[in-house]
A protein has these predicted regions:
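Conserved short beta-strand element of beta-propeller blades
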Residues: 19-46, 51, 64-85, 163-173, ...
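Short loop/turn segments that connect beta-strands within beta-propeller blades
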Residues: 56-59, 184-188, 312-316, 375-379, ...
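Residue-level signal for tight coil/turn positions that link beta-strands
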Residues: 40, 48-49, 58, 140-142, ...
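Autoprocessing Asn-cyclization modules and mimics
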Residues: 22, 66-71, 82-156, 161, ...
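Short beta-strand segments
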Residues: 62, 130-132, 191, 262-264, ...
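Residue-level signal for WD-repeat beta-propeller blades
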Residues: 10, 37-38, 45-46, 55, ...
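Predominantly a core beta-strand signature of beta-propeller blades
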Residues: 15-18, 60-63, 189-192, 317-320, ...
Length: 477
């Protein structure tokens, strides 16, 4: 029977519900990083040796292998989920099959669990461009993935990427080998990544931000179309009238037609033309494309400084960005960061002057009401944007989650909730939790979960409380 949601503001009051508590209480630095895949698992990192996965379908927690993070766990630790997995391989954006058939892909990965229901994207080789649901897979060394039967057999020239969760975690304290690691869901492994290029010490508060192309059970396109022509380093759609440079640092993927499967970072854009690194196969007028967030980039901000860092997953390397305008002031305790890409206002969705996908919004925290945003395409900060009323301040203990047009905020450890309307630049009270929580601690343990049944979508906001094992959720009405 289809789900219907008859809840209405004023008529129906929002209610906080208690859900399964975690087995260990939150401490300074503890955080939850949300996977945006269809199962919506939540990674809870509580110390250098403790990590748990929350499954909202079952309302249950399970302990994971130790993160074995270097450093001293405290305020400043951060994590984020990416959309695409390369297993235990680092400095790569894809994997290569060892063989296969029309319905199987032989891998060199040791897959530890069933990936049925997740997806696999064929980047090049036979059947290039298709994104297929995983029917089943073998467990263990050199796992074999089964998909629906395709026109051609997969071979050792098949290049692919797994659409399964992978979490990137940055520890706190003095950085050393093991401070920056990834947890790969498919292989159930932690792998050390490079931290060269980051500050020597991580503290205060900080956030990792991803800009993935995949959301829930499909690609989240900012724009799409069919090319009218291309060169070795460009893709042209002469029917477009884009604002110059609006797509810089986004990503273009050839969905079908000539060059299908290829993915490139956009380095320049004009009214009709995207510039990219050299194509392996030059697209043409048959090439259907999508422009999305960039799967290769992670951003790190915080640490009591205005400096903004960017990590390349394919390069396993950090760089320090030099924005045209620097952030006006450093973020502090209780800061936030959210990549905004789902605003429904037409000003934001206009493809010729797109705003969705361009901005990372960040409340500064540190007993401040200020909010700034980083423009990804323009590589610049816009500081202290005007909104009303800008009277509530946020600091240690504040928790945030972004969904659609709004950023949801729990202030400090007061149980008071607010909802920041992004396109309207307005702050509203949301309600107050009638519960008791412990002392305020740095670390974001708030997230959102979607329930979907056909066209019906119901969103819940969850929060694991300050210095507590207790977790609650509330339906968005």
């Amino acid at each position: 029977m289809p789900t219907t949601n008859g809840n209405r503001p004023i008529l129906d009051l929002k209610r906080w519900e208690q859900v399964t508590p975690s087995s260990v209480a939150t401490i300074a630095g503890a955080f939850i990083a949300s996977s945006r895949h269809f199962r919506q698992q939540q990674l809870y990192v509580r110390s250098t040796t403790e990590a748990f996965l929350y499954n909202p379908n079952e309302d249950g927690w399970v302990q994971l292998p130790s993160p074995a993070l270097a450093g001293t766990f405290a305020a400043g630790a951060a994590g984020v989920s990416g959309a695409w997995s390369t297993g235990t391989t680092v400095a790569a954006s894809t994997l290569t099959a060892t063989g296969g058939s029309t319905s199987t892909i032989n891998t060199n990965q040791t897959i530890a669990r069933s990936l049925a229901g997740y997806s696999i994207h064929i980047v090049s080789g036979p059947n290039a461009g298709v994104t297929l649901s995983i029917v089943s897979n073998t467990i263990g060394t050199n796992s074999v993935i089964t998909v629906a039967t395709q026109a051609s057999a997969f071979t050792s020239s098949t290049v692919y990427r797994l659409c399964t969760p992978v979490w990137y975690v940055l520890g706190s304290g003095t950085l050393a080998s093991g401070s920056f690691r990834k947890y790969d869901f498919a292989t159930n492994t932690w792998t050390t990544l490079v931290n060269t290029g980051l500050p020597a010490t991580i503290a205060t508060d900080g956030k990792l931000i991803a800009t993935p192309s995949w959301y829930d059970d499909g690609y989240e396109a900012l724009a799409s179309g069919t090319a009218t022509s291309a060169t070795g380093t460009t893709l042209v759609n002469s029917a477009k009238n884009w604002t110059a440079s609006q797509w810089v640092n986004s990503q273009v993927r050839i969905v079908s037609g000539t060059g299908a499967g290829q993915i490139r970072t956009i380095t320049a854009s004009t009214a009709t033309t995207l510039t990219v690194a050299t194509w392996t196969i030059t697209p043409d007028a048959t090439s259907v494309y999508q422009i999305t967030g960039n799967d290769d980039f992670l951003y790190y901000m915080g640490n009591g400084a205005v400096t903004l860092f960017r990590y390349s997953i394919s390069g396993n390397s950090w760089s320090t960005l030099t924005p045209v305008a620097a952030r006006a002031a450093a973020p502090s305790t209780g800061m936030s960061a959210a990549w905004v890409r789902q605003v429904t206002d037409t000003t934001w969705t206009d493809e010729n002057a797109i705003i969705n996908g361009r901005r990372i919004y960040s409340f500064r925290g540190g007993v401040s009401a200020a909010i700034d945003y980083y423009d990804i395409a323009a590589n610049t900060w816009v500081s202290a944007i005007t909104y009303a009323p800008a009277t509530e301040t946020f600091t240690t203990g504040s928790k945030y989650t972004y969904y659609g047009n709004f950023i949801y905020i729990q202030k400090d450890a007061t149980n008071r909730w607010f909802r920041f309307n992004i396109p309207a630049a307005a702050m509203d009270g949301w309600n107050t939790m009638p519960v008791v929580q412990g002392a305020a601690v740095v670390g974001d343990t708030c997230f959102d979960i979607e329930y979907k049944d056909g066209a019906t979508e119901i969103v819940y906001i969850y929060m694991l409380m300050n210095t507590s094992t207790q977790m609650y959720r509330q339906m968005v009405i």
